[in-house]
Amino acid sequence: GRGGMGGGMMMGGGMGAGGGMGGMMGGGGITSSWMGGLNGAWDLFDGDMELSGNYLYNGSNSYVEQESHKITYMVDGSELIDDQTGTSTRNTGGHRFGVRLDHEFSPNSSILFEPQFNFGGGDFSEFSDFSTNTIGTDGVERKSNKGFNTSYGDNENWTASGRFLYRQRLGKAGRTVSLNANYNFSNNDMTSFNQSLTQVDLNEDNEWDNNPTIVNQKYLQNSKSSSLSGRLVYTEPLFEKLYLEASYQYSWSRSKNIKDAFDSGTNEFGDGYIIYNPIGEIANALYSNSILNENVNQRAGITFSWQTDKLTAQLGASAN
């Protein structure tokens, strides 16, 4: 028999899709993609501020159709005839917005801010059917099994990220302080269905048995991730070519992935389709999970640097 568990997955920074049955469907097919965007830049406040922005949209769709016919010749003289057909469609679309702001408050102080926001989604649909017949040593062709696999779903996602840099000179030449901070937040929601049906002829009467093997499941998946990091650096000139650099770095990240699986309340089916019925659906703990990861890292360090036109030497120590 055939069938089994699956469920596609569509991820990406505002533009991405996927999914799969893991069967005969592979790459290739017909793919169309497109993109377009806008860019702009401005000098403001008598040149003290440089501001630029950009927007990009891209999308794609693909279609794959495959068919196979295979004959296996057995040692005893019998033959297995295996036929498969399959189709796959995928669509994606996403938007990206970005800004770059570089502002100089004075010859000694400036900031740089580069935020970006992406959002988008996609959908997929895959279907394959199969049949296997046996030609015995008596030359008679008999039914063995037949069925189909299908999976389909859609997702929505967004990502917000950015970088902030503050730079400050502190009077004495070479004495500086800087702060570099980064952030990233993302979310992806997906609903997908995984269905399969397999019929067999166990008693070899050339009639399909009345109780096919059916998989009829729904998946609700959510992925969230967050990260923050920052690095503070102070530089002090000790002598003409000797500098002391003291730094502190902090980073935090958290990710959570949840997958809830459900079995259909009923299993109504026809030729090439199964209906998922949310009424009476049952949570499937075996294929559900929740994973949480969280990390915090801190580091402090001191570095002595000797710099000349031809040589740079460093000696440092750090603690986590």
Regions found by a protein language model. Give the residues of each.
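Primarily recognizes Gram-negative and organellar outer-membrane beta-barrels
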Residues: 1-320
